[in-house]
């Protein structure tokens, strides 16, 4: 039975208290956010695609945690089986530490270890991940020719069928891993000792609570900190009104659903190319709301249909209010949507307006999202995470995809509530 894994080791490096709580008080964890779930799904999808780069492998994924020990034995047997050339999710254990290696490939009389990442670059955390895996592999006496990180090539442009040889790039981290081995051995011994203690280590809250990842025990450790979120928001109204202009202009509220797939879907696209896969337009012509919705979730190749529809539907308004983390004008210009000067000047990203007007509240310090702003302005209300829409949009379940229209409308109505409240309409 193992004591540590790759994830718990990395957790210990970030905060020893988090490691202790995870192993001894897991029920204190925060609920997994929709954003985290979306990231996990993206990583899993890229990992499965990476396996096709090395076809014909054996999947060693355990069916349950109780099967880890069995899979460790099977993995080691496969290393000496000449008929086995590739394994996926191979399971190794050394020094009470268990790892599951994304891909391991026979390389002559040795093996090449590969860790897959869905990012466009390599971070220090990824390097440490690989160094730990190297430590366990060497401890298991696996003859290694190299250990590499396999990640997305930012310069790849799709032209026809997906070219995995061009989509992925490799970087050896063997030299780095070898230099880190003594540190890892000491850390593992230290972490195992911490886990055995009767009480969690006394560690004050600080930057480690959010770096490099937001800690899943954030709510527990911060529960006694005075709740600044109870204080009302502040804003520079003079700047706000200058940016808004005439409050009585005819206004439409636009909620755009962008998709940035790690793997390009269409010819001419690069990894993480952004395009519109759905939108909701909300307006009020007198007494009743007017709502127009569109999406192409059943066929993403139809995404360009959104552009003329948006141009047509927004043409009759003096102003279009949206809320987006990206530069919305630049994004729409890429789709040739804003070639018309008549439409270009109408688009107003209310997120940028609030930031320029120094909108301040405890909730938006680390997350200037629509949800955080809404709950700052209306402290007695809540709004779901936007990542819920992303997850449902990418779901294979038609019922979950059908929820998108309603959620886009709800976000749009929340934006209108914020707008009217803040500018006192």
Regions found by a protein language model. Give the residues of each.
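Acidic, Mg2+-coordinating catalytic module of metal-dependent nucleases/exonucleases
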Residues: 160-227, 373-425
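A residue-level signal for conserved active-site and pocket-lining positions in enzyme catalytic cores
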Residues: 15, 103, 133, 215, ...
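Conserved DEDDh/DEDDy metal-dependent 3′-5′ exonuclease domain
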Residues: 84-90, 94, 98-102, 113-116, ...
């Amino acid at each position: 039975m193992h004591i540590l894994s790759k994830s718990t080791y990395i957790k210990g490096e970030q905060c020893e208290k988090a490691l202790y709580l995870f192993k001894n008080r897991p029920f204190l964890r925060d609920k997994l956010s929709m954003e985290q779930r979306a990231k996990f799904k993206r990583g899993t999808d890229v990992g499965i695609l990476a396996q096709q780069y090395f076809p014909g492998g054996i999947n060693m994924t355990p069916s349950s945690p109780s099967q880890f020990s069995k899979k460790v034995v099977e993995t080691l047997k496969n290393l000496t089986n000449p008929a086995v050339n590739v394994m996926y999710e191979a399971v190794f254990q050394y020094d009470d530490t268990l790892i599951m290696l994304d891909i391991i490939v026979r390389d002559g009389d040795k093996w090449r270890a590969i860790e897959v990442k869905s990012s466009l670059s390599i971070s220090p955390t990824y390097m440490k991940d690989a160094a730990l895996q190297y430590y366990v592999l060497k401890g298991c006496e696996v003859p290694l020719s190299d250990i590499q990180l396999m990640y997305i090539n930012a310069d790849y442009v799709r032209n026809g069928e997906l070219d995995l040889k061009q989509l992925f790039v490799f970087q050896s981290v063997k030299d780095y891993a070898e230099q880190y081995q003594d540190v890892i051995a000491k850390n593992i011994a230290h972490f195992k000792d911490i886990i055995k203690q009767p009480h969690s280590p006394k560690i004050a809250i600080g930057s480690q609570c959010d770096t490099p990842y937001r800690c899943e025990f954030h709510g527990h450790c911060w529960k006694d900190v005075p709740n600044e979120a109870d204080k009302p928001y502040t804003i520079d109204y003079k700047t706000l009104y200058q940016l808004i202009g005439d409050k009585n202009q005819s206004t439409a509220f636009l909620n755009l659903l962008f998709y940035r797939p790690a793997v390009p879907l269409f010819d001419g696209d690069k990894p993480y190319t952004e395009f519109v896969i759905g939108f909701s337009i909300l307006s009020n012509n007198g007494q009743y709301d007017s709502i127009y919705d569109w999406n192409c979730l059943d066929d993403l190749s139809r995404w360009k249909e959104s552009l003329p529809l948006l141009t047509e539907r927004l043409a009759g308004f003096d102003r279009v209010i949206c809320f987006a983390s990206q530069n919305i004008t630049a994004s729409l210009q890429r789709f040739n949507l804003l070639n018309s000067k008549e439409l270009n000047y109408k688009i107003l990203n209310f997120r940028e307006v609030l930031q320029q007007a120094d909108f301040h509240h405890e909730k938006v310090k680390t997350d200037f999202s629509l949800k955080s702003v809404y709950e700052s302005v209306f402290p007695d209300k809540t709004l779901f995470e936007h990542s819920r829409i992303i997850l449902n949009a990418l779901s294979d379940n038609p019922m979950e995809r059908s929820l998108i229209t309603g959620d886009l409308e709800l976000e749009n109505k929340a934006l209108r509530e914020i707008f009217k409240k803040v500018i006192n309409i």
